[in-house]
Amino acid sequence: MIKCTRRINFDAGHRIIGHKNKCQFLHGHHYVLEITIAANKTDTLGMVIDFGLIKNLAKKWIDANFDHNLILHQDDKEMGQQIENYTRQKIYYMRNNPTAENIATHLKNEIFPKLFVSQNFFVTSLKLYETQNCFVEV
């Protein structure tokens, strides 16, 4: 198996409903997302996937939905709507708390399978860095 990884950076805010410490408050991170795609063999050009294709598909989705936006739990809709009305900022709602674990799982299981439709390669893992020192891998 051959693997290729592409890194994408984005900035987003979130909060964790029910957290007992400072993560219960709105705050932001400079996220780094590493997308690893694998194939059993390369294509006729000798590639698993063109790195530009990963960038075009994944970064386009990230920029449209996460970058410089708020990622909130759907139970935070009332607050999100007030923020959106005041700032015109886009809010991305998730079915669960927007922890690094849940964001990475959401991307890997729900978003990227729709973006990377191919029988020749597949997303094997995602690493999502919330800080330089803290990341999750799914």
Curated annotation (Swiss-Prot):
Q: Which SUPFAM superfamilies match?
A: Tetrahydrobiopterin biosynthesis enzymes-like
Gene Ontology molecular-function annotations: 6-carboxytetrahydropterin synthase activity; metal ion binding
Q: Provide the active-site residues from the annotation.
A: C23, H68, E130
Return the cofactor note field: Binds 1 zinc ion per subunit.
Q: Pfam families from the xrefs?
A: PTPS
Kindly list the positions annotated as binding Zn(2+).
H14, H27, H29
Kindly state which reaction or reactions the protein catalyses: 7,8-dihydroneopterin 3'-triphosphate + H2O = 6-carboxy-5,6,7,8-tetrahydropterin + triphosphate + acetaldehyde + 2 H(+)
EC number(s)?
A: 4.1.2.50
Q: Which InterPro entries match?
A: 6-PTP_synth/QueD, 6-PTP_synth/QueD_sf
Provide the cofactor list for this protein. Zn(2+)
Q: In which pathway does it act?
A: Purine metabolism; 7-cyano-7-deazaguanine biosynthesis
Keywords, alphabetical: Lyase, Metal-binding, Queuosine biosynthesis, Zinc
* Segment forming the signal sequence: none
Q: In which domain of life is the source organism classified?
A: Bacteria
Function, as annotated, reads:
Catalyzes the conversion of 7,8-dihydroneopterin triphosphate (H2NTP) to 6-carboxy-5,6,7,8-tetrahydropterin (CPH4) and acetaldehyde.
- Recite the other comments: The active site is at the interface between 2 subunits. The proton acceptor Cys is on one subunit, and the charge relay system is on the other subunit.
The family assignment reads: Belongs to the PTPS family. QueD subfamily.
Looking up PANTHER family in the UniProt record yields: 6-PYRUVOYL TETRAHYDROBIOPTERIN SYNTHASE, PYRUVOYL TETRAHYDROBIOPTERIN SYNTHASE
Question: What name does the UniProt record give this protein?
Answer: 6-carboxy-5,6,7,8-tetrahydropterin synthase
The organism encoding this protein is: Rickettsia prowazekii (strain Madrid E)
Its ancestry begins with: Bacteria, Pseudomonadati, Pseudomonadota, Alphaproteobacteria, Rickettsiales
Gene name linked to the record: queD
